[in-house]
Design a protein with these regions (language model features):
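Short hydrophobic beta-strand motif reused across regulatory alpha/beta modules
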Residues: 416-423, 468, 478-485
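Short polybasic linear motifs
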Residues: 7-15
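Bateman (tandem CBS) regulatory domains
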Residues: 282, 366-382, 388, 435-446
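Terminal peptide-recognition signature
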Residues: 120, 202, 306, 397, ...
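Short glycine/proline-centered loop/turn elements that form peptide/ligand docking sites
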Residues: 134-137, 380-381, 390, 414
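PLP-dependent amino-acid enzyme catalytic core
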Residues: 20-371
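The conserved cystathionine-beta-synthase
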Residues: 383-401, 408-409, 427, 447-466, ...
């Protein structure tokens, strides 16, 4: 198979030490002793959108197939949404819907918002992004760092509810005469971006040899634009939908029936309605993928192939792997690395988050030690010694986002607890106490419960506004707080 190579258009002269040979894009040193393909130099970050490389995944079981991924995470905004954002804004400018200094408003799971923030920053627009509250903290912080106004709304309501994120964005734009509501779910430029850029790139990179394309539906632009392009050139190319369990789309494709929407944690794909730009007739089959499988496959992708990708990529890859393993003849299968996984480090790449949400099973004891979020014997918790300065203790509590820490002596026995109220009292009493040791401010009265205690034994501890120290004569096992008990009871529902 021919693999396309070459420099992007607009590359600048890199100096006299190298020269470009013919039009191959390969640069040679003057003495011809070494070769290198150099990336071009751009004058604006928006010029870097598109023309992303492809990678063949070699370490997964793909049956008789070959599986390629388009590395859309390498766009400057770290996602495939850069493509649609620049196309939709260009179209709005040309039509006069967006004027200089205007306001861009969009409902997004985050990546479209980040792409729009990139463009707004370069072109001088204001940006308001409305997001469901299940999205990662990294996305929210990233958007705000780029100057966007972020409005969080409920993720547990469907279209038509006054707090549904798309309806809120539309209302905000309607009330501001200078605002342009992007509305990626109904914007034809969304489809155009993939039909004119993403799909042709893949077609050229794989020399037109594509038997199946696997994608998810967030707004519908990817499936509609790329699916149409591939079907026009190869009617036998199968368009495969990767859909989270809880979305209404997979049942609609496979069973031709409409189901009530559920909930899912994967971000960016799956829907509780059919976006108007989505051409369902292009989809040949669908796979419904659980959150657990999506997260597991995304984590495997990092371990096996070194690709740090987002949660929706786990869904796409899980579906692609199922498709590949079902085949009896060799096929070329393509899917997407939609975004970079750095935005999910606090979620699916965080073992504690995975445990809290039931996606990783820890060894169990069958007693209240199973309620401990961070186990001391496994070095998961954060502790202090009595001599640590109070300023250092405050720094650690902030760094680790904890409200209390156990204070241990040299024998690993709990001699006290330092919590937020202790710190507050210390600062109120003496503003110059930063160098004073923790022992001067910690609570020496600790509520110790044995591992054999019952859940009911924890209630008096919490009523006394204390934290439970789980320990016996041999070991300190960890702390149990109110939220730990709440999480435990939540999992029993």
């Amino acid at each position: 198979m021919k693999i396309a190579r070459g420099m992007r258009s607009g590359a600048r002269d890199v100096g006299q030490d190298v020269e470009k040979v013919a039009d191959t894009g390969v640069l040679y040193t003057r003495d011809m002793t070494a070769t290198a393909t150099l990336a071009p130099v751009f004058s604006n970050i928006l010029e870097m959108i598109g023309n992303t490389p492809m990678l063949e995944l070699k370490r997964f079981n793909v049956g008789p197939c070959r599986l390629f991924v388009k590395m859309e995470c390498l766009n400057p905004g770290n996602s495939i949404k850069d493509r649609i954002a620049v196309t939709m804004i260009d179209a709005a400018e040309k039509s006069g819907k967006l004027r200089a200094g205007g306001r861009i408003v969009e409902a997004t799971a985050g990546n479209t918002g980040l792409a729009l923030a990139l463009i707004a920053g370069q072109k001088g627009y204001r940006l308001t992004v409305v997001m469901p509250d299940k999205m990662s903290d990294e996305k929210i912080s990233h958007l705000r760092a780029m100057g966007a106004e972020v409005i969080l709304t409920r993720s547990d309501v469907a279209k038509g509810h006054p707090e549904y994120y798309q309806d809120i964005a539309e209302r905000i734009a309607r009330e501001d005469p200078d605002a342009f509501f992007v509305n990626q779910f109904a914007n034809p430029a969304n489809v155009q971006a993939h039909y004119e850029t993403t799909a042709p790139e893949i077609w050229a990179q794989l020399d037109g040899k594509i038997d199946a394309f696997v994608a998810g539906v967030g707004s519908g632009g990817t499936v509609s634009g790329m699916g149409r392009y591939f079907k026009e050139r190869n009617p036998a190319c199968e368009i495969v939908l990767a859909d989270p369990v809880g979305s209404i789309l997979a049942p609609l494709v496979n069973e031709k029936k409409t189901v009530a929407p559920g909930s899912w944690l994967v971000e960016g794909i799956g829907e509780d309605f059919i976006p108007s730009i989505l051409d369902m007739t292009l989809i040949d089959k669908a796979y419904a993928i659980t959150d657990a499988e999506s997260f597991e496959v995304a984590r495997e992708l990092l371990k096996l192939e070194g690709v740090l990708a987002g949660s929706s990529v786990g869904t796409l890859l899980a579906a692609a792997l199922k498709y590949c393993r079902e085949q009896t003849t060799p096929k070329i299968v393509v899917t997407l690395i939609c975004d970079n996984g750095a935005k999910y480090l606090s979620k699916m790449f965080n073992d504690f988050w995975m445990v809290d949400n039931g996606f990783i099973a820890r060894p169990t004891y069958g007693d209240i030690r199973d309620l401990i979020a961070r186990r001391h014997l496994e070095r998961e918790d954060f502790c202090l010694t009595p001599s640590v300065p109070i300023a250092q203790a405050i720094k650690r509590m902030r760094m680790y986002s904890v409200s209390q820490m156990a204070v241990l002596d040299e024998h690993d026995h709990v001699v006290g607890i330092l919590d937020e109220s202790d710190v507050l009292l210390a600062l109120v009493r003496d503003r110059d106490c930063s160098r004073s040791p923790v022992r001067d401010f910690m609570s020496s009265r600790v509520e110790t419960v044995k591992p054999t205690a019952s859940v009911q034994d924890l209630i008096p501890v919490f009523r006394a506004d204390r934290v439970a120290v789980v320990a016996d004569a041999k070991h300190f096992y960890g702390l149990i707080t109110r939220i730990d008990l709440i999480n435990y009871l939540r999992k029993q529902l």
